[in-house]
Swiss-Prot record:
Protein name (record): Fumarylacetoacetase
The UniProt record lists the keyword Cell membrane: no
Mutant lacking the gene: phenotype: RNAi-mediated knockdown from hatching results in stunted growth, reduced fertility, progressive destruction of the intestine by adulthood characterized by the thinning of the intestinal wall and loss of intracellular lipid droplets, which eventually culminates in lethality. RNAi-mediated knockdown results in activation of cellular stress pathways, and thus the intestinal damage is most likely due to activation of oxidative stress responses and ER stress responses in the intestine. The reduced fertility phenotype is enhanced in response to exogenous tyrosine or homogentisic acid.
GO biological process: homogentisate catabolic process; L-phenylalanine catabolic process; tyrosine catabolic process
Pathway in which this enzyme or protein is active: Amino-acid degradation; L-phenylalanine degradation; acetoacetate and fumarate from L-phenylalanine: step 6/6
Taxonomic lineage: Eukaryota, Metazoa, Ecdysozoa, Nematoda, Chromadorea
Length: 418
């Protein structure tokens, strides 16, 4: 399938993708829901009346909102109908937009003229710890090889509740956090800027569909109906603050200062060709977490760092999302097994995605092995992030000549306020 809209070679956004986002322009500061196609954005508010199928005819107003929450809250058949209609309208064989110059001029906006915003109002944010390679590496560093994985790790998707208010969209700079740290040889903690600033290469999915009532669970057979779409996520971390504060309740200030997400939400339907077999799980998890259908995604991921004053990004790690041990379905089913209600717009992070080799580690903590190794970044070296470093995450699926991308997830570290 091809679009009448020109799609540059190696674009993240061919007609097979069609991710959703929220944008504004200098000419119109109002926020609108859009779909990326090539280097353009299709403004869905301008074509809302064209969604006239059985699922969406009575819900055209969802495309005129300033966030995706109302659309996300519709059931999955509505998402499928919207995607099919947008593909039809953008296809080279459909005259509705192609031959209507006036409508086309209103509905298509150059991405270069747009400012992207968070795609949804995020009510709650949960971060999992689903990479066995990352969990093993961190366990070896802090507890030794014999106790790398905690006893519960292979029985359930470990997670914690994060801070939704400090989630920001790609391109937002962040200040180095300050807090308490304690050096190994110090008798008391000290206060000041974190010296061990880190990124975490993650992906996250937005919850959609009608809310499950408090006290009811989402069975794993129905979990896909609640997974709206996927974004890149950088779970910025202050490792020295984390090391001092995390016992016994887990991360707090070391994580809550900022989390960056990419602006374009790639639907599960767009990613369907890239599902691969799930990892072997030993021991076999409890029945409520068991599913045989492939729901592991083959997404090539990379992290680059651009030091201040440098003109280019330098890749420091390459890995793949398929290395995760726990699937998205398992994460969602586990989250609700106690009766927790999930709402449209909630965000669930994967945890750091690391592969089995050193170059596939998804954090500076692992790449530098807790500061014991130097990581080349162009002509410079790093053990952790310095002020002025700009970090970018990228993700691409490729199969049968079709490339599906996620855009950028970029943020720059600014000096701390002391």
């Amino acid at each position: 399938m091809k679009s009448f809209v020109s799609v540059p070679q190696n674009s993240d956004f061919p007609i097979q993708n069609l991710p959703y986002g929220v944008f504004s322009t200098k000419a119109d500061s109002s926020r609108h829901i859009g779909v990326a196609i090539g280097d353009q954005i299709l403004n869905l508010a301008e074509i809302a009346n064209l969604f006239d199928g059985p699922q969406l005819k009575a819900h055209q107003d969802v495309f005129k909102q300033s966030t995706l929450n109302a659309f996300m809250a519709l059931p999955r058949p509505a998402w499928l109908e919207a995607r099919a209609r947008i593909q039809q309208l953008l296809s080279e064989d459909c005259a509705v937009l192609r031959d209507n110059a006036h409508l086309r001029s209103r509905a298509l906006v150059a991405q270069s003229d747009a400012t992207m915003h968070l795609p949804a109002q995020i009510g709650d944010y949960t971060d999992f710890y689903s990479s066995i390679h990352h969990a093993t590496n961190v366990g070896i560093m802090f507890r030794g090889k014999e106790n790398a994985l905690m006893p519960n790790w292979k029985w359930l998707p470990v997670g914690y509740h994060g801070r939704a208010s400090s989630i920001v969209v790609s391109g937002t700079d962040l200040k180095r956090p300050v807090g308490q740290t304690k050096a190994p040889d110090a008798e008391v903690p000290s206060f000041g800027p974190s010296k061990l600033m880190d990124f975490e290469l993650e992906m996250a999915f937005f919850v959609g569909g009608p809310e499950n009532e408090l006290g009811t669970r989402v069975p794993i057979e129905k979990a896909e109906d609640r997974i709206f779409g996927v974004v890149l996520m950088n779970d910025w971390s202050a490792r020295d603050i984390q090391a001092w504060e995390y016992v016994p309740l887990g991360p707090f200030l070391a994580k809550s200062f900022a989390t960056t997400v990419s602006p374009w939400v790639v639907s599960i339907e767009a990613l369907r060709p890239y599902f691969v077999e799930n990892p072997v799980q030993d021991p076999v998890p409890p029945a409520y977490l068991h599913h045989d259908d492939p729901f592991t995604l083959d997404i090539n991921l990379a992290v680059s760092i651009r030091p201040e004053g440098d003109a280019v990004d330098h890749i420091v790690c390459k890995t793949n999302f398929k290395h995760l041990y726990w699937t998205l379905k398992q994460q969602l089913a586990h989250h609700t097994v106690n009766g927790c209600n999930l709402r449209a717009g909630d965000l669930l992070g994967s945890g750091t995605v690391s592969g089995p080799e050193e170059g596939a580690y998804g954090s500076m903590l692992e790449l530098s092995w807790r500061g014991a190794k130097e990581v080349p970044v162009g002509s410079e070296i790093r053990k952790f992030l310095k002020d002025g470093d700009e970090v970018n995450l990228s993700g691409v699926c490729e199969k049968n000549g079709v490339r599906i991308g996620f855009g950028e997830c970029r943020g720059k570290v600014l000096p701390a306020d002391i």
